Amino acid sequence: MDSTRLLPDKKPVRNNQMPRKRGRKKDGLSVEEGKKALIHQVAQGRSIKDALTVIDRTRNTYERWRKEDRFFAQLVDSARLGGAQDIEREHLSFPEFSAKYLEAEVFPHTQNIVDLIDGKDPDWQHPSMTYEPGEKDLVMVNLPPEHGKTTAVTINYSLYRLAMDPNMRIIIVSKSQAMARKMLFAIKSRLTHPKYQNLQLDYGPPGGYAANSEAWNADRIYLSDDIRDSGEKDPSVEALGVGSHVYGARADLIICDVIVDMGNAHNFDNQIEWIQAELMSRISANGSMLVVGTRLSSRDLYSEIRDPHRYPEEESPWSYLAMPA
């Protein structure tokens, strides 16, 4: 996809409605600023009730934020557990983080994927796209090849989530173990290579992310015990080939990236059985799973796993977004 074709001059108006105005409360805080302020107050030791009083928001507003923004809910929960003294300085948006530490711009089609992972509707919609909302924890995205999804989402977004919350548990799945290992290697490099020193200094523990790590190998990594809850048994990031044994018991983010190719596109029944049995059961309470790739056939994993007849209620649970070139 030519990225220049994806950059809209203005966001499209949905459903023939007038664009919504993003209002500010009398204290001048936008919604995102209000969320950051609440996290700051909770990280300082205040209760949710007291924090809401300070930022002049209601309990209903807080509950709505939690429901609509899974990432916000995880950050608040981390702050409440007392292990988030760094939450305030870390709470950048993904585009801010990507630009500052990774020197990478987040384009609209990438932000759409991130929005869905975070439990939101895609911010940019176009008549050429297909969007079918479903459950917020099951996300499928189809788009043409060579769109940078692996670098921008599987690698950079996973890295962002680890920086925001070192207790994150991520599973990365690809068509082969070797391919998944390459994705994990890219994450490891950003956590240790001098090129990303600013990221490591601002977010990592004094000895580095790999110091005092339970494991730091080709298949899985545990962030340093100096920054991660030592009681957490599941890997920080685990790399799997489709159909492999899953080591971790739970995951906050599962990304299935390029698990279908011309060699296995016909094998969708086995792929679906493995995803439903081995992956969907491991999604944590506030977690989500993304399946992203390119359609290769009229019948493949991407179409068949959304078949309503595969589910007891005869309704597909997947939130689905297709973005053409």
Which residue ranges define each predicted feature?
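Short, flexible loop motifs at catalytic/binding sites
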Residues: 1-26, 32-325
